[in-house]
Structures are given as structure tokens and as C-alpha cells.
Amino acid sequence: MEELDRSRAFARDVKRIVVKVGTAVVTGKGGRLALGRLGALCEQLAELNSDGFEVILVSSGAVGLGRQRLRYRQLVNSSFADLQKPQTELDGKACAGVGQSSLMAYYETMFDQLDVTAAQLLVNDSSFRDKDFRKQLNETVKSMLDLRVIPIFNENDAISTRRAPYQDSSGIFWDNDSLAALLALELKADLLILLSDVEGLYTGPPSDPNSKLIHTFVKEKHQDEITFGDKSRLGRGGMTAKVKAAVNAAYAGIPVIITSGYSAENIDKVLRGLRVGTLFHQDARLWAPITDSNARDMAVAARESSRKLQALSSEDRKKILLDIADALEANVTTIKAENELDVASAQEAGLEESMVARLVMTPGKISSLAASVRKLADMEDPIGRVLKKTEVADGLVLEKTSSPLGVLLIVFESRPDALVQIASLAIRSGNGLLLKGGKEARRSNAILHKVITDAIPETVGGKLIGLVTSREEIPDLLKLDDVIDLVIPRGSNKLVTQIKNTTKIPVLGHADGICHVYVDKACDTDMAKRIVSDAKLDYPAACNAMETLLVHKDLEQNAVLNELIFALQSNGVTLYGGPRASKILNIPEARSFNHEYCAKACTVEVVEDVYGAIDHIHRHGSAHTDCIVTEDHEVAELFLRQVDSAAVFHNASTRFSDGFRFGLGAEVGVSTGRIHARGPVGVEGLLTTRWIMRGKGQVVDGDNGIVYTHQDIPIQA
């Protein structure tokens, strides 16, 4: 669902384009040509050529292709004894000479099939020092472009006088980013496109889920914020080289976009002015606002505020809604004034009467909205209701309770009253909310959002409800499947279809099992050892097995921590520690807290208290099953109430998180997702369920010695 980006509008008017294809795009995993990607690239360039664009291609790949051919020839001509000898590295210049003809032969074959003529031009950096060379280069390229020929440039590595090595420790290809930037400047290109193996420039390694894609690079803002990861598996410089080349070209007046060469349509999207990849532009620092992080920050803030909302009492949540209703009526004049500006703009723009009618916010409609909010406030609190209570076994009680979904993203069209309805439903159901209304109601939505968020107490925060003001932010939000739980598009079928096709987030319209056991300072030691051992050892590969053991810091002093560790290690469990536990226990540090071992191994970490455990689970858990072992009832209830997982247990092994053991019959799977509602969605449709289990130290132990009763317990009103 890419949208036109105003800062990219210039791309629709370019004529001369330099496209550089990186080695990681040219080749596949085995070092061979990626025929599918290159074929798609040639088709895009041929289409641009026929549409009147002047296309110049800079392609890497010769060294690698030559190395592959020479190695094959060596293998064919080697005896068995030769193969046992250490293999020497092939000379990069020889590889370049052999591979260049193969690379060009492929391009000629592909372009011939597309009825396009291509030409090869090999250059060296020293040549550009010659003024006559640069003049002749421009004349030759101009003649080719006038004849609709696509020039294909590469550095002439075979006779290059560079002293730098022609290979690195991780790959086989050379890099042409600086050559592409140089050619773009020398040939007066309107745009340089650098095709990479990632979507663009990220704030950190692209594999890191916390890394954010930078849409517009601002040197003053981003230069010190970026952490580069490993360079390309094949190329010489990777993203570092691309950024340096892009900055040099952009500050000299040539706009640059780094984007993925893996998508067959990205060049076309760039030229349509869509927001793909990372833009480098000499005027970028003058554009405001720079909103690269707004989408994620807004979603994370909504989630944090929703947890604060859920922690309030039922009466306090009710009061928020009543205050909102009062605020709506108190601000009728202001709301009406802003709404009239929207209506006037819509009429001036020639919108259909039916759409204009939906825009209108009369005093009567505002009063009606306030009344509906009060009615919602008077409803029974939907959060934390016990829906079912079961005695699983003697002394082991299971409750099914209602719980908020989390963070909702609602995309709706030109009905400002929908904002009030959706916001009040979200607050009643304890959810964080992000809203994107139609541009026709921009002023109305803004004032309604302000009135509502001003009525939310500081203990929760106005960021509970975020208002998305630009369509350009929607694609970013749709990528945030780690912080947004449900998308509800309210609009045309096209809108719903577009969103469904461009997001991993569940869409309501027309996993990992990283389970935690937290052992509190008030635990029964023997019970803790039984539960921890059972949670890890009863079936280590199960998704409900313990993967992380969290221990209260006080247990280090009274030797309980050592007893828990011994119980695991004596049964063959390999332990890895967090930063704190690895030093205390002298065990290897875990690579990540977000790791599911599915084996006789787990992570151990020491936390300050129950709040530290809850925070750790929220940051590193998968919302599957988490358990607390404690004799402190208040601490247990705090944990059960605040841990936002599908199943939360007190004094019971995580292995009980199973359809059969819950008395549900056969199990299809364990879902950590939250989508479930069908039909008209009110408060109930914005809720999910959680399982709360209270036990007395029971363990599964292969179901030996436990009698399942599965008796329904009456729910007290």
C-alpha cells in the first residue's frame, strides 16, 4: 500500500537515470547469476527505454562469474591428489577478465529478446582525471542514448591499478557504488538508483527487529544514529559504501534512492514517486517534519498507555469516558467551527453530497455522541470478567477471563463521528488506538482527537490514542506487526483489500513459545524446584516448555538460586545467562533473550523484583505462557493481572498450557494471536481471553499421580 510521497514527486519528471545493480542482487546464494532477478531487471529497463527514459546501467558481477568459471575449470582438470591440496585463491584480475564477457553475454541475450540494444563500457578511475576522456565519454553516451542504446558500465578490474585487495574475507565480488555516483555526476543524470539486497538504509542491521527503515536520509540527523552491520555477503563495501556514494552524489545535486533489487517493481515505484527505499537529497535537511520514527513511536506509546489504562480500577476507566462526554458537550462551539471549515472545503472541492452530509457535525450530533459515550460508560466493565471457571484437578483451578486485544489501527473514511465512537470503544475495552481518518475531515478529526485526549488523565496519557495525519505513514504502520495487534479498515473494498495484501497484522474487515517461570523471593523452595524442572524437562521441545528462568535477586543470597540451577544442570540442561546471571553463575551469556531452544537448554536471568520480571516478559516474551512461583498472594495477583500473555499461571508448571489439560478436548494449536471477532464489532469484539491458573504446587510429571476432574465451578456474580 505504498503512497505518493510529496518529497519524491520530482522522480516522476526525471529523464536520465543511472541504475546500479549490486553484486548481492546479481547473484544467488551459490554465487551463480540470479537469472530471475536479472531478467526482471532487464524487463524494467527495457520498458523504461521504450517509454523515452535515458537509462544507464552500472553492473557488478564480472569477478565472481570469472572466479566461478575458473574454479570449475580447475576442478575438471584436477586429479584426486590435487583436490587434497590446499586451494589457492584465484587472481581477481584474471577472474575479472574471464567473467566480464560472460556477464555481458547474459545482458546481450536478455536485451536482444526484449528488442533492445546494449553496449559495454569498461572504465578505470584514472581515466576520469583526463579532461578529454570525460568529454569523449559524454559524447559517446549521448550518441548511444539518442539511438535508444542502454550503456552498461563496469570497472575494468582486469587491468585496474588499484592496490586494494580484490576480495574480502566474506565474499567474491567487487563494488561499483562510487563508480555509479561518479557517472551520475559526469553524465548529468537526473536520478541515481542503487539496488541492494535490503529495502534501504536502516538505523541498524536490517535483521535487528528494532532497526527502522530511514525513508529520507538527513546527514545532520542520521549520521550518528546509524549502526552498520555486516557488509554484503559478496560486495566490497556493502551499505557503508552505498551511503558514502549516495551522500556524495546527493550533495552534488543528484538525488539518490537506495532500494531493494529483489522486488521486480521497485524501479517503477521509484519513478512513480512512491515511498520506497531511502532517499538522499541535497535539500532533505530543509524538509519538515522528519518523521522516520513517528509510526513506531506512536504505536509503542499507545501500547504503554493501554497497559496503564488496564491497571486502573473499573470506576476510574468509567470516569474517563464520562469526562470525555462532558468535554464533547463543553467544546461544541469549537468542534462546530472546525467542522464547518472541513465542510466548506469539501463543497469547494466538489465532493458528492452524500459524503459532505457524512462530514457534518451538528450540535445535536455531538450531543448524541456524548450520550452514547455515557451509555458505554454505564455498561458492565468488560475487562477481567471471568467467563469460565474449571477445577482441572484437586486444588488446581482454571479461569478464562476477558482481556483487551492491545493496540488497534483503525483506518476510516470521511465520518468524524466515527472517531468518537471508535475511541470510546477502545477506552472501554482497554485498548491502545491509532486512528487514520479521511483527509476530508482533517480539521474535525484533529479537534475531536484533542478534546478526547485532553480528557484522559496524565496517569494514562493522551498517547493512548494516536492520530495519524499523513497517508504516507500508513505503510510504515502496516509493517509494525510487533506492536499493532489488529487493523480495522472502515471504507471501500479496495481499501480493505489493499491493507490485507500489504500487512502481516491480522485484518478485521468486509509462534514462538518463549515461556517464562519467575521464582519470587517468597517461593516455597521445593515447589519452585519441581515446577522449574517440570516446565523444562517434562517435554523440552514443546512450545509450552520453559525457555527462560527469572529469579528474584534475593534468592542469590540464600542459596535458592544455586538449588534451582543444580536441579536443571543435574538433569542435563545447558544453561545460558543474561548479563547479570552469567556473571553470578559463571555460565555463557545468551545470544538473545528472544530465543526458543526447544531442547534441554534455557536462559537464566536475575531480576530486581516482580516488576522487573513483568517488564522482562513484556520485552522478550512471546505472549504464550508465563508462570510465577510464590507464596505471596498479592505478588501473585499482580503478576496474573499484569502479564499480557495468553496463559498466566501461579504455582503451576507452564506445561499445563495445553488444550487437553485445560479440558478443551483436542488441540489444534496454541495461538498467541488475538484475532477472533466476526460480524459487527463492539466492545466484545475488541477483547480476547486469557487463562488464569491457580495451583498448589502441582506438576505434570507425565500426568502421573494427578487425577483430572475438569469440573465446572459456578461463577459468582
Curated annotation (Swiss-Prot):
Q: What pathway or pathways are given for this protein in its record?
A: Amino-acid biosynthesis; L-proline biosynthesis; L-glutamate 5-semialdehyde from L-glutamate: step 1/2; Amino-acid biosynthesis; L-proline biosynthesis; L-glutamate 5-semialdehyde from L-glutamate: step 2/2
Segment Gamma-glutamyl phosphate reductase: which positions?
Answer: 297-717
**Region (Glutamate 5-kinase): which ranges?**
1-296
Please provide, in alphabetical order, the Gene Ontology terms of the cellular component aspect for this entry: chloroplast; cytoplasm; Golgi apparatus
| Residue positions binding ATP | S196, D197, R236, G237, G238, M239, T240, A241, K242
Cite the InterPro entries for this sequence. Answer: AceGlu_kinase-like_sf (IPR036393), Ald_DH/histidinol_DH (IPR016161), Ald_DH_C (IPR016163), Ald_DH_N (IPR016162), Aldehyde_DH_dom (IPR015590), Asp/Glu/Uridylate_kinase (IPR001048), G-glutamylP_reductase_CS (IPR020593), Glu/AcGlu_kinase (IPR001057)
EC numbers: 2.7.2.11, 1.2.1.41
At the top level of its lineage, which domain of life is listed? Eukaryota
Q: Which GO terms describe its molecular function?
A: ATP binding; delta1-pyrroline-5-carboxylate synthetase activity; glutamate 5-kinase activity; glutamate-5-semialdehyde dehydrogenase activity
- Binding annotation for substrate: S60, D157, N176
Task: Provide the alphabetized UniProt keywords.
Answer: Amino-acid biosynthesis, ATP-binding, Kinase, Multifunctional enzyme, NADP, Nucleotide-binding, Oxidoreductase, Proline biosynthesis, Transferase
HAMAP family linked: ProA (MF_00412), ProB (MF_00456)
| Protein name as catalogued | Delta-1-pyrroline-5-carboxylate synthase A
Q: Which organism is it from?
A: Arabidopsis thaliana (Mouse-ear cress)
